[in-house]
């Protein structure tokens, strides 16, 4: 398999740190933020952002996992009524289909704000998804695939 590393562990750490600072800067007057990570990598990114923000501010921050299979979504725990500032997080945005269905699901909750964050935006949107926070924008062909590994050998690669 021919694969090209596009982000190494240090680069991923730096992007997550920068995204965390952006979240803090854009939410100066907000005391509580709810991070909702799409299962697996989106949730892992959300937990890392939560850790960074907790260590660097006094904001209350909560992380919830959003599990999904075939357009069926389920939160790992309910969003409390007072948690109205939500950031939906995923690792890679390709067509926007997963995020648009997740947004549709989350609109049933009473939120003041819903923002989106991705580690890598592939620029192949087929759905009208606006991103509020983007780690990296990378134009690829439709045949190429980006894989993000946030495990032991952390990297993002193109194949």
Label for each model-derived stretch:
Residues 21, 25, 47, 51-55, ...:
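Short, well-ordered alpha-helices that flank and scaffold nucleotide-derived cofactor binding pockets
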Residues 78-90, 135-141:
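A polyampholytic, Gly/Pro-enriched intrinsically disordered region
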Residues 1-30:
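Active-site-facing substrate-recognition patch
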Residues 32, 60-62, 85, 113-116:
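Residues at the starts of beta-strands that form the adenosine-phosphate
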Residues 28-39:
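Short glycine-rich phosphate-binding loop at a beta-alpha junction
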Residues 16, 47-85, 97-100, 126, ...:
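Short, glycine/charge-rich flexible loops or terminal/linker lids adjacent to PRPP-binding catalytic cores
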Residues 26, 104-159:
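PRPP-dependent phosphoribosyltransferase catalytic core
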Residues 84-107, 111-113:
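Internal catalytic or translocation cores that form aromatic/hydrophobic pockets or channels
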């Amino acid at each position: 398999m021919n694969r090209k590393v596009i982000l190494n562990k240090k680069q991923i750490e730096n992007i997550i740190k920068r995204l965390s600072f952006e979240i803090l800067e854009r939410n100066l007057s907000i005391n509580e933020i709810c991070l909702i990570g799409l299962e697996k990598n989106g949730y892992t990114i959300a937990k890392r952002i939560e850790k960074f923000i907790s260590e660097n501010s006094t904001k209350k921050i909560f992380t919830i996992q959003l599990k999904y299979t075939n357009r069926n979504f389920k939160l790992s725990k309910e969003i409390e009524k007072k948690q109205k500032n939500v950031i939906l997080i995923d690792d890679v945005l390709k067509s926007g289909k997963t995020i648009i269905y997740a947004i549709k699901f989350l609109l049933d909750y009473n939120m003041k704000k819903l923002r989106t964050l991705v580690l890598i935006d592939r620029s192949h949107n087929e759905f009208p998804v606006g991103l509020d926070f983007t780690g990296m924008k990378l134009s690829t062909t439709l045949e190429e695939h980006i894989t993000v590994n946030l495990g032991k050998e952390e990297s993002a690669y193109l194949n």
